[in-house]
């Protein structure tokens, strides 16, 4: 898919990776850019159109797809995460329910709402922001990892379903990204600007998957018995 001249809708575009996507898209010459956010007044980036959007609200998602009928690129970026003390933490169940509503059901809602829009506008694309914990889940991220694994499965099914209809589906796998949400983690983090750029490069090349950092590449290789994770 060609970014220049496209019309994009980015969920959670008011901060972090979503904001990085918005800036990168503007820099690449999108025709129009919608920012799907819960509070449109909190969007300060010049050049984007704020749209009230909550992935947990089916009516809001449907309304956004209806009012943004010229979209050709959907980026499902909105997400939530929180650490557990362990996989046996009683809070895992409640956390998983909360995370599923946004990280999994939210992607399904947005994809189902916007797919007819993309089809109506000709060739289009969907980018789903996933994680490296899709493949390797540390105990403190057990609930979060489960929701991202579920989202990965849906992404793969969606790709098969719409491929012959002209819609490209790209899965973004990445580890910790340097945003306000990861500020408390003392780990190596990726620059959100580089992640956004690498993802859009992959989209324009027609890829189905992008591994945005070295750790994610290593984790994917570890799925092979010949390259176990260490």
Identify the residue ranges that each predicted region occupies:
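Active-site helix of classical SDR
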Residues: 14, 111, 147
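Rossmann-fold cofactor-recognition segment
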Residues: 46-58
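Conserved mid-core segment of classical short-chain dehydrogenase/reductases
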Residues: 81-97, 120, 140-143
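A short, exposed helix-loop element centered on a Lys and neighboring polar residues
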Residues: 111-112, 156
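Residue(s) in the substrate-gating loop at a strand-loop-helix junction
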Residues: 131
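Active-site-adjacent segment of SDR/Rossmann-fold oxidoreductases
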Residues: 136, 157-168
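C-terminal helical subdomain
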Residues: 171, 179, 183-221
């Amino acid at each position: 898919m060609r970014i220049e001249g496209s019309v994009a809708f980015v969920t959670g575009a008011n901060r972090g990776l979503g904001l990085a996507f918005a800036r990168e898209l503007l820099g690449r010459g999108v025709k129009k850019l919608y920012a799907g956010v819960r509070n449109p007044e909190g969007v300060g980036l010049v050049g984007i159109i704020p749209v009230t959007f909550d992935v947990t609200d089916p009516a809001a998602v449907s309304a956004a797809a209806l009012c943004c009928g010229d979209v050709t690129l959907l980026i499902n970026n909105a997400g939530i995460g929180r650490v557990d003390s362990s996989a046996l933490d009683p809070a895992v169940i409640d956390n998983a329910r909360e995370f599923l509503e946004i990280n999994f059901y939210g992607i399904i809602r947005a994809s189902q709402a916007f797919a007819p829009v993309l089809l109506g506008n000709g060739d289009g694309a969907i980018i789903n922001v996933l994680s490296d914990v899709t493949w390797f889940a540390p105990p403190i991220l057990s609930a979060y990892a489960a929701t991202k694994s579920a989202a990965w499965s849906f992404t793969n099914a969606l790709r098969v379903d719409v491929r012959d209809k002209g819609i490209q589906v790209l899965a973004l796998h990445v580890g910790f990204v340097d945003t306000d949400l990861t500020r408390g983690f003392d780990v190596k983090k990726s620059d959100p600007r580089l992640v956004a750029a690498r993802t859009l490069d992959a989209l324009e090349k027609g890829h189905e998957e992008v591994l945005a950092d070295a750790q994610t590449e290593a984790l994917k290789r570890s799925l092979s018995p010949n390259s176990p994770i260490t």
